């Protein structure tokens, strides 16, 4: 059979491509193929949608839109009333933006096509609201029932409360009458007053709780009783065994019934007494005011305030009668309500003017305030013994640290100190407080609880305490009378006045030279290192010989300093100079440059993975750890006690990071020398000197010998003599300026052995 082409498919109405003439199936026989474009009779454009319209089993709009206007949707109308909701949704909410679609409903204002005769336009019918005949409210009946039930319950409670009050009042009145009759029958008139005083206390207590209602005047007149029924004569007396006990009347309290109390006053929760603020609280149940307990003592005077508030007492001089009248009025108005006794421990009267504080309590509160004052706390802290009074203070050697100055800052202080153990030299430097505390606690080993005492000791030694100025007695008047002058003149004799004028003239003559001050300057030098020389200025006008001698002395001074200074070569053992074992290479200690050199050699060698340093003191081990940190290496501590040493290892970061030479150079400028902790120097290296006792020759002097007669004359090469000769002095002259020269010849002292002064005369008298 010959192959049929695509253009033969879908003949008829709505073929696959809309070209067929037949009824239109999938192959040209049905009513429209799947890809029909509406060329046939009544084609909609999409044959699949056409099938959905006709074959859908879902009623359109659940039957609510049965009278749907088909003019809006151009589809073939069949005999069935089922339409596809998907196409309806696509029409109204799809991509189409027709003015009649619901998608554009929010964009068009009002009923735009109200006047158009088209049936496809939206309706313009107004909305009508019709009142229903019956109100459907199921909760309405329940609310009415509950309201009636609550009213019945309230009425029952009121009847019960009124009945209890009336019964209590009747019991109270009957009880009082029976007590009076029993007392009159049993007790004689003589002892009746004593018994009444004893029985007053429980009655008064009960009257405070519940007071009887006063009887109106009309009721009192109607209930008058004859005197015979009230009074009688007791002729028999009574015995103590037959004395009846007087019954007491008590009324049960109803805690549920409370009288509502209203007030028009505003409550302020802070009470200010002088400069003290007190927190108050209000109890809505009994309308009382009390001091709120603060759990945290946020104020240094909180203990004092609480003690004062405990001692506050309410003065009862004027309030007793007023309170009694108020309670009586309230009892008459409504007997069912009763008053709860206010607590006197924390209650505060509404009238602040009536508060009183007893003098004894005020003294106690002042003592408490003195104990809680911050000055007293400082005194208790200062009771710790000063530095130097405990054995723990002598654990460290304070002579190793010499603090000569202190800079007091806002957060921390700086110290200007001299410490060979820290710096490696005897020059003073400024260090911060953290470094100073690390030196005192870790290196020197001072106990931590004595640190404040040590810092206070240093501060007091450098900063003198301010002493009160001496009184000048400027407010005391001294009289200048002739009697005082005569007394002073009598004390000074004529012998004392001799030569005063000469002394005054001599003092005024030398006044300029006496107060002359010389400036002190450090030596000025030129050059560095071995070429360093003393700078001699032309203003000094020194001779060449003197200048050369000064230069020689300055160079000698530098050489002596250089000899004392130790270099890194001094610590290396010559026999083990190239050894990898640092224990043998540095037998006694290391220089800080030796540590840097060992790290440089270690980082260059790829075959060496570990480096072991000899044991040093804690600060030395910490310095090695710092070097390893900035060389990007790992360190571990090994050993115990004086055998503690540092073990250094390379890590992956060592290869890919360059050392931080800026910080490493700063470390080399700090402490220079680190001695080993586990080894001491051999004794044969010390030059031991032995003391040899030689017989001392007695110094003999002769009678009449001049002291210092054989002393040599000062040489002409002496610097002091050269300076004097430059100033104009010559041999045989006295020292000094013209007109005030000293003696030209020295005073001679002659040895005298034959006589011994007063002792000789005393022996002579005894003989």
Swiss-Prot record:
Keyword Nucleus: yes
SUPFAM superfamilies tied to this protein: R3H domain
CDD domains in the cross-refs: R3H_G-patch (cd02646)
GO cellular component, one term: cytoplasm
Domain R3H as annotated: residue spans: 589-652
Pfam families named among the record's database cross-references: G-patch (PF01585)
Protein name: Protein SQS1
Organism of derivation: Vanderwaltozyma polyspora (strain ATCC 22028 / DSM 70294 / BCRC 21397 / CBS 2163 / NBRC 10782 / NRRL Y-8283 / UCD 57-17)
Gene name linked to the record: SQS1
């Amino acid at each position: 059979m010959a192959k049929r082409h695509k253009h033969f498919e879908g003949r008829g109405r709505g073929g696959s491509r809309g070209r067929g003439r037949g009824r239109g199936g999938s192959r040209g026989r049905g009513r429209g193929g799947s890809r029909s474009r509406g060329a046939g009779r009544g084609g909609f454009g999409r044959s699949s949608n056409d099938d959905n319209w006709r074959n859908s089993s879902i009623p359109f709009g659940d039957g609510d839109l049965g009278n749907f206007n088909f003019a809006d949707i151009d589809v073939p109308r069949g005999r069935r009333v089922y339409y596809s909701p998907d196409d309806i949704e696509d029409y109204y909410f799809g991509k189409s933006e027709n003015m009649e679609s619901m998608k554009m409903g929010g964009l068009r204002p009002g009923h735009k096509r109200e006047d158009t005769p088209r049936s496809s336009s939206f309706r313009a019918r107004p909305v009508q609201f019709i009142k229903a005949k019956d109100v459907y409210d199921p909760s309405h009946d329940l609310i009415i029932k509950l309201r009636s039930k609550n009213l019945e319950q309230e009425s029952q409670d009121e009847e019960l409360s009124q009945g209890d009050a009336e019964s209590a009042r009747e019991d109270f009145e009957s009880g009082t009458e029976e007590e009076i009759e029993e007392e009159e029958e049993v007790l004689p008139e003589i002892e009746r007053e004593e018994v009444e005083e004893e029985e007053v206390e429980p009655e008064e207590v009960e009257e405070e709780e519940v007071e009887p209602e006063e009887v109106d005047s009309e009721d009192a007149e109607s209930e008058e009783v004859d005197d015979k029924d009230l009074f009688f004569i007791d002729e028999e007396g009574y015995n103590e065994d037959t004395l009846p006990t007087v019954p007491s009347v008590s009324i049960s309290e109803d805690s549920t019934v409370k009288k509502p109390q209203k007030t028009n006053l505003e409550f302020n929760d802070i009470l200010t007494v002088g400069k003290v603020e007190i927190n108050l609280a209000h109890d809505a149940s009994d309308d009382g005011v009390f001091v709120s307990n603060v759990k945290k003592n946020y104020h240094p005077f909180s203990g004092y305030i609480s003690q004062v508030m405990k001692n506050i007492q309410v003065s009862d001089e004027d309030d007793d009668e007023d309170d009694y009248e108020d309670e009586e009025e309230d009892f008459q108005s409504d007997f069912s309500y009763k008053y709860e006794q206010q607590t006197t421990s924390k209650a505060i009267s509404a009238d602040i003017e009536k508060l009183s504080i007893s003098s004894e309590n005020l003294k106690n509160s002042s003592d408490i305030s003195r104990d809680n004052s911050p000055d007293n706390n400082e005194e208790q802290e200062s009771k710790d013994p000063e530095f130097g009074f405990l054995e723990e203070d002598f654990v460290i050697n304070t002579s190793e640290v010499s603090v000569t100055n202190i800079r007091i800052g806002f957060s921390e202080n700086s110290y200007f100190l001299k410490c060979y153990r820290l710096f490696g030299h005897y020059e003073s430097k400024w260090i911060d407080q953290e470094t100073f505390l690390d030196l005192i606690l870790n290196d020197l080993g001072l106990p931590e609880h004595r640190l404040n005492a040590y810092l206070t000791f240093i501060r007091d030694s450098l900063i003198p305490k301010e002493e009160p100025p001496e009184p000048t007695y400027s407010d005391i008047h001294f009289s200048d009378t002739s009697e005082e002058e005569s007394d002073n003149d009598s004390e000074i004799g004529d012998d004392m006045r001799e030569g005063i004028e000469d002394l005054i003239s001599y003092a005024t003559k030398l006044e300029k030279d006496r107060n002359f001050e010389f400036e002190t300057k450090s030596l000025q030098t030129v050059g560095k290192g071995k070429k360093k020389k003393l700078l001699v200025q032309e203003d000094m006008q020194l001779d060449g010989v003197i200048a050369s001698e000064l230069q020689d002395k300055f160079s000698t001074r530098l050489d002596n300093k250089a000899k004392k200074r130790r270099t890194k070569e001094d610590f290396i053992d010559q026999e083990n100079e190239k050894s990898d074992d640092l224990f043998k290479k540095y037998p006694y200690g290391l220089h800080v440059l030796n540590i840097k050199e060992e790290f440089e050699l270690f980082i260059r060698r790829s075959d060496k993975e570990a480096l072991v340093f000899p044991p040093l003191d804690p600060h030395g081990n910490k310095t090695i750890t710092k070097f390893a940190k900035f060389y990007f290496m790992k360190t571990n501590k090994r050993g115990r006690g004086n055998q503690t040493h540092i073990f250094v290892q390379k890590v992956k970061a060592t290869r890919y990071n360059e050392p931080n030479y800026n910080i490493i150079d700063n470390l080399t400028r700090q402490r220079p020398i680190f001695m080993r902790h586990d080894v001491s120097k051999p004794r044969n290296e010390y030059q031991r000197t032995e003391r040899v006792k030689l017989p001392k020759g007695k110094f003999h002097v002769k009678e009449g010998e001049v002291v210092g007669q054989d002393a040599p004359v000062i040489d002409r090469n002496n610097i002091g003599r050269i300076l004097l000769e430059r100033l104009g002095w010559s041999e045989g002259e006295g020292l000094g300026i013209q007109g005030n020269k000293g003696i030209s010849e020295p005073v001679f002292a002659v040895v005298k052995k034959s006589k011994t002064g007063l002792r000789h005369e005393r022996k002579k008298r005894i003989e």
